[in-house]
Amino acid sequence: MRVTLSTLDTCESSFTPLVVIELAQDVKDETKEWLKNRIIAKKKDGGAQLLFRPLLNKYEKETLENQNLYLVGASNVRLLLGAEAVGLVKECTDAAMRAFTYGTRHNFKGFHDNNNDFLTMAECQFIIKHELENLRARDEKMIPGYPQAKLYPGKSLMRRLLTSGIVTQVFPLHDTEALKKLEDTWYTRFALKYQPIDSIRSYFGETIALYFGFLEYFTFALIPMAIIGLPYYLFVWEDYDKYVIFASFNLIWSTVILEVWKRGCANMTYRWGTLVMKRQFEEPRPGFHGVLGINSVTGREEPLYSSYKRQLRIYLVSLPFVCLCLYFSLYVMMIYFDMEDWALSLHEDSGSEWTSLLLYVPSIVYAVVIEIMNRLYRYAAEFLTSWENHRLESAYQNHLVLKVLVFNFLNCFASLFYIAFVLKDMKLLRQSLATLLITSQILNQVVESLLPYWLQRKYCARVKRKVQALKSEVDTTLYEQVLLEKEMGTYLGTFDDYLELFLQFGYVSLFSCVYPLAAAFAVLNNFTEVNSDALKMCRVFKRPFAEPSASIGVWQLAFETMSVISVVTNCALIGMSPQVNAVFPESKTDLVLIVVAVEHALLALKFILAFAIPDKPRHIQQKLARLEFESLEALKQQQMKLVAENLKEEYQEDGKEAT
């Protein structure tokens, strides 16, 4: 019997809840009933054909506090059909990666009719999210019970419910048993070991697994730099000419690790299926607004906004504001140097041990101020980028990343460039770099993980006491879990995590010939970062929906750009050293020309290495080429079959006319 969506039952009273929908407390009953009917309705009737029930039944509502929470799930067959709809790629029995189809399900590795583990829980939740987001308005002109909440044909109902405040949040539930197993193999025992990246991917999805994979790879890639930099730091502190070898190694290292990462990333994402997964058509982001019109691509009615108006907002408002923030950052930097001069003069006047400690205070204060400014600017950048009214989420993210990277780069490194190339004080440069690096690492650990974890523990204790005080006769395990998770913070993505690594990469690579110990501090920080980030994902934030990814995206370009800038800075610093200057006592022009020539040679070597190392391993390239060939052959056969059917129909019609 061929299974189709129209034959599936959506009235199961008991099912495994995967996703929670929270409604506002004052939502009207007719709205709840309408939403329920749309979620459980069959696909042919415009529904999502999912399983849906309130968290509390009538009896439990009398005993427990009603929270307007609803559980969403799906039958195994419905999830498999959904996997085909979203284009999930799975491994076949012949070891090839192909898009999953329900009709050919037995050709896929690990599939059995009675096996519910073929799809990971992250994939199941991603499918449900996709189905909820693809619930479209049909004939309704408004949300029942809310005449002010207008609906337009073809637009996403869930996004409209969220923007109108009827639905307050939609989030996936944790699987407590699977989470406990993951924690045991991931971070509960502090040890120098590889992370369970495949298990992280199965639980949290590809985007988060790629971040932890990159964090692990970057940490181990830093170890050679740390080992080589340690003796340089201990034995040749002032001999800058001897740092030429170390700086040259650093420049080659930064290129090789980024190219090798691309190959490793291709291996991982091919194994996960996201490298060959077809990109879904991108819908307008929830915050996008404009005059109602017809989309020329989809033919659907949706808000339209002139790109000319958007460009005006960017160049007349956003750009001047960013420049103003950059100016303010430079102004704060000059105040920091005034504080340095004050501390130095105080120490020279007294010469005591206490005033020698005071020399580090301006750098520590400045590092804290930098972190505060970075976070305040982030909020301003998000507001401005949202106000620019970008239609697509990808465009929004690209503009946000550009704003944040430019400001963070200047805010974190401007003082170091000023010390290096204006003041030319290498001792102060070492001191400032070390202070900024270590202080920022400590602050990030406390603010991002430890403080939120402590606050979450306090809230968990309050909820548990509240539930235990009810002394209800019903099982409150699921109720307590949902209540705890709904109040957890929302994980906003890997943006801040990659940004932290990007800045760390800058501290390590930009001034490596002055402070070789930076790599060692980065390694120590990253070993604790793995555990604190894992704790953050498992215990501090709500479980995020899985997002398929084939790479680390724009961050690859950001790291490569930083490595190019590091070539210029290290060559300039070596050229400024007294030992190198002594070789050219008469003509500084010759020195400048040689430094520029060496810098160009290193950049040329860098780009040659990047070109010589393929982004994808040979065997992956062959498999991708084979998949493309099979796809073209299948399309060709489908067209030939269609032509044959048309010819057959024409032949039959001609035969009828002849008789």
From Swiss-Prot:
Stored InterPro entries: Anoctamin, Anoctamin_TM
Keyword Transmembrane helix: yes
Keyword set, alphabetical order: Cell membrane, Membrane, Transmembrane, Transmembrane helix
One matching Pfam family: Anoctamin
Record's subcellular location: Cell membrane
Keyword DNA damage in annotation: no
Tissue: Predominant expression seen in epithelial tissues.
Positions on the Cytoplasmic side per record topology: 1-207, 262-316, 374-400, 522-553, 612-659
GO CC terms: cilium; intracellular membrane-bounded organelle; plasma membrane
Membrane topology: Multi-pass membrane protein
Intervals, Extracellular compartment: 229-240, 338-352, 422-500, 575-590
GO molecular function, one term: intracellularly calcium-gated chloride channel activity
Domain of life (superkingdom): Eukaryota
Transmembrane segments: 208-228, 241-261, 317-337, 353-373, 401-421, 501-521, 554-574, 591-611
Note: The term 'anoctamin' was coined because these channels are anion selective and have eight (OCT) transmembrane segments. There is some dissatisfaction in the field with the Ano nomenclature because it is not certain that all the members of this family are anion channels or have the 8-transmembrane topology.
Function summary: Does not exhibit calcium-activated chloride channel (CaCC) activity. Can inhibit the activity of ANO1.
Similarity comment: Belongs to the anoctamin family.
Name under which the protein is recorded: Anoctamin-10
